[in-house]
UniProtKB/Swiss-Prot annotation:
GO molecular function annotation: GTP binding; GTPase activity; metal ion binding
SUPFAM superfamilies tied to this protein: P-loop containing nucleoside triphosphate hydrolases
InterPro entries: G_TrmE, GTP-bd, GTP-bd_TrmE_N, GTPase_MnmE, MnmE_dom2, MnmE_helical, P-loop_NTPase, Small_GTP-bd
Keyword presence, Magnesium: yes
Annotated cofactor note: Binds 1 potassium ion per subunit.
Complexes and interactors: Homodimer. Heterotetramer of two MnmE and two MnmG subunits.
Subcellular location: Cytoplasm
The name this protein goes by in its record: tRNA modification GTPase MnmE
Claim: NADP is one of the keywords in the record: no
Cofactor(s) in the UniProt record: K(+)
Source species of the chain: Chloroflexus aurantiacus (strain ATCC 29366 / DSM 635 / J-10-fl)
A Pfam family reported for this protein in Swiss-Prot or TrEMBL: TrmE_N
UniProt: K(+) binding residues: 224, 243, 245, 248
Length: 452
């Protein structure tokens, strides 16, 4: 990290401003080679200067604002300079090219955040939260990411890891003196404390994962039960074509929706039936594929029509999938829907009318509640583990800690107990970045954009 990197920090295309970011030991000197302030003088940290960006041949590229954030009071803990110019593609690109010609290197994806991590500005879980903030699709997901960026998860994990390291140091010292033996009370308490923390973090992980990553929800049923109308009602826009002709939908249609704070991909499908129409049959096959890849199925029936063999076939088709049974076309809310047919994985039954909007809010909330395991998170609940990598590391830590408890209770060899505790400590260290290799870091930071 002895060089200075530069990249465009704003999205491509036209906008109000475009930002070129530099970080490294030569950020100030490079910036002054390409930026001519209207009022001469040295750059001051966290102050904005007005001037012009100058190209390699002395030509004016654009008028701009320059902001210096001097080390260590910057995101990367290095000297950081941001040049804000007009947001057209050409001024931004020419400003970046001028910085590169003046001695900067084009940054790799996520390299600014990587430098912040390597310089101790943030831990690895906070680095990942930075990307989660950028990619958040709902306010709940954003709140979880912001809380993780604030360091709550790192504090919890470090506390659990410290509780492990103290007895581990004690046990390691005894390996060379096995005749002294382990005092169980010295070790059991910290192990129990660490395991309690890990289990508490895991308890909210399933909800956190859904709120961060979303879920795929497929609408299935025989033709003309109102699947496309339900999709439009849940989206609150006319996205799918709706006609009274069975088989109108010939392909899958995917749309993103925010249902009670849960990011959901809603998938409308062709009515599933045997057809001699080759185009419709392709649609039926795609519907089956969408069902196989869904987290939840909305099995739609027409409450105004008798139950049919095709409806029975849909019960079989969804038997291995968590399912909400939806009675559509309940246009009169005072008339109860038919009894729900038996289904081995039915999570709920909802009556609604896509035509008049009755029960649509209830359906949306039921979808969200089902995906979150039966309950919506409390208002303001942001301390939820939401990253699959973190959940996997916590699960490994819990396994090692339970094994350590069994090893201790059995009075087994000291080195076996030390191995269990070392495994738990290393698993927790993977979350904060204290025990990770370069390959994992490369994988994580490659997901970032170049300017972050």
């Amino acid at each position: 990290m002895n060089d200075t990197i530069a990249a465009i920090a704003t999205p491509p295309g036209e906008g109000g401003i475009g930002i070129i970011r530099l970080s490294g030991p030569d950020a100030q000197s490079i910036a002054l080679r390409i930026f001519r302030p209207v009022r001469p003088g040295r750059l001051r940290s966290h102050r904005v200067r007005y001037g012009h960006v100058i190209g390699p041949d002395g030509e004016v590229i654009d008028e701009a604002l320059l902001t210096l954030m001097a080390a260590p009071h910057s995101f990367t803990r290095e000297d950081v300079v941001e040049i804000s110019c007009h947001g057209g593609a050409l001024p931004v690109q020419l400003t970046l090219e001028a910085a590169l010609a003046a001695g900067a290197r084009l940054a790799n994806p996520g390299e600014f955040t990587l430098r912040a991590f390597l310089n101790g500005r943030i831990d690895l879980s906070q680095a990942e939260a930075t990307l989660d903030v950028i990619r958040a699709q709902t306010s709940a997901g954003l709140a979880i990411a912001q809380a993780q960026l604030g360091g709550w998860l790192a504090r919890e994990v470090r506390a659990a890891r410290t509780a492990i390291l103290e007895p581990l140091a004690y046990i390691t010292a005894l390996i060379d003196f096995p005749e002294e033996g382990i005092e169980p009370q010295t070790v059991a308490g910290p192990i129990e404390q660490a395991l309690a923390t890990v289990e508490r973090l895991l308890a909210g992980a399933d909800q956190g994962m859904v709120l961060r990553n979303g879920a795929r929800v497929v609408l299935v049923g025989r033709p003309n039960v109102g699947k496309s109308s339900l999709l439009n009602a849940l989206l609150r826009v006319e996205r799918a074509i709706v006609t009274p002709i069975p088989g109108t939908t010939r392909d899958t249609l995917e749309e993103m929706a925010n249902l009670a704070g849960v990011p959901v991909v809603l998938i409308d499908t062709a009515g599933m039936r045997t057809s001699t129409d080759p185009v419709e049959q392709i649609g039926v096959e795609r519907a089956a594929a969408a069902l196989a890849g869904a987290d939840l199925a909305l099995l739609v029936f027409d409450s105004s029509q008798p139950f049919t063999p095709e409806d029975e076939a849909m019960l079989v088709a969804t038997a291995d999938r968590p399912t909400i049974i939806v009675w559509n076309k309940c246009d009169d809310p005072d008339v109860p829907p038919p009894p729900a047919p038996p289904h081995p994985k039915a999570m709920a039954v909802v009556a609604c009318s896509a035509r008049y909007g009755h029960g649509i809010d209830t359906l949306a909330k039921t979808i969200a509640t089902t995906l979150l395991g039966g309950t919506l998170p409390a208002v303001g609940a942001t301390h939820l583990v939401s990253n699959p990598r973190h959940r996997a590391a916590l699960r490994r830590a819990a396994e090692f800690l339970r094994a350590a408890q069994e090893t201790l209770a059995a009075g087994a060899a000291t080195d076996l107990l030390a191995a269990d505790l070392t495994g738990a400590a290393n698993a927790l260290g993977e979350i904060t970045g204290e025990t990770v290799g370069e390959d994992l870091l490369d994988m994580i930071f490659s997901r970032f954009c170049i300017g972050k």
